[in-house]
Curated annotation (Swiss-Prot):
Protein name in the entry: Uncharacterized protein YpgQ
Species classification: Bacteria, Bacillati, Bacillota, Bacilli, Bacillales
Database matches in Gene3D superfamilies: 1.20.58.1910, HD-domain/PDEase-like
Domain HD positions: 26-129
Taxonomic superkingdom: Bacteria
PANTHER family: HD_PDEASE DOMAIN-CONTAINING PROTEIN, SUPERFAMILY HYDROLASE, PUTATIVE (AFU_ORTHOLOGUE AFUA_1G03035)-RELATED
Pfam families cross-referenced by the UniProt entry: HD
Length: 205
């Protein structure tokens, strides 16, 4: 009962911060990731309170958020302690969210994620692929002023730099199964885009 109340407080807090975010790292994304992470975590026998908490706060420190929205690691930690999750649990959550980003993957060679961290990372990556991943890719490009194609910062280039690589980077068997259909849909979309815009690959490379 205590953890349920804490989770609800954290949800309300995170939602108040991310409601107006427009780059695809908004409250809807976080809510989907939390649901996916809980599903994966249950299948993988993880600590579901840690999974849900880490999923809810995972984007608050992301550099892709505007400075006016993004929080520091210490601010997130202090708020979790304020909600009563305890310093040990707060430490576990911080360990996850500071190592799960695509750009942080080098850290994992030295300090692999816990099963809770793997569940959250997989959920975040699943939300970056498939139909919702395609939609988010264009939301992000639009928010940052990047084009559809034509250079290395374009939405089209992002599929090759990151999104089409994520299927093979899933940690858990559960996520690997879920990723297959999403990856194939995304690949089909990219191939159709290349048919619709002849030479798009040459213009982007």
């Amino acid at each position: 009962m205590k953890e349920l109340k804490q989770a609800e407080q954290i949800r309300t807090w995170v939602q108040s911060i991310l409601t107006d975010e427009s780059s695809g790292h908004d409250w809807h994304h976080v809510s989907r990731v939390a649901d996916l992470a809980a599903y994966i975590g249950e299948k993988e026998k993880a600590d579901l309170f840690i999974v849900e908490t880490a999923a809810l706060v995972h984007d608050l420190i992301d550099v892709k958020l505007p400075d006016t929205v993004r929080l520091s690691v210490s601010e997130v930690y202090d708020q979790l302690v304020f909600f009563g999750v305890g310093k040990e649990n707060a430490d576990r959550v911080i360990h996850i969210i500071t190592r799960m980003s695509f750009r942080d993957r080098g850290k994992l060679a030295k300090e692999p994620l816990s099963i809770e961290g793997k569940a959250v990372q997989d959920a975040d990556r699943l939300d970056a692929i498939g139909a919702v991943g395609i939609a988010r890719a264009f939301m992000f490009a639009g928010a940052k002023g990047h084009g559809l194609y034509g250079d290395e910062q374009s939405a089209y280039a992002h599929f090759f730099h990151k999104l089409l690589r994520l299927k093979d980077m899933m940690n858990t068997d559960t996520a690997r199964e879920l990723a297959e259909e999403r990856h194939n849909f995304m690949l089909q979309f990219v191939r159709q885009l290349e048919k619709d815009i002849p030479g798009i690959d040459a213009e982007t490379s």
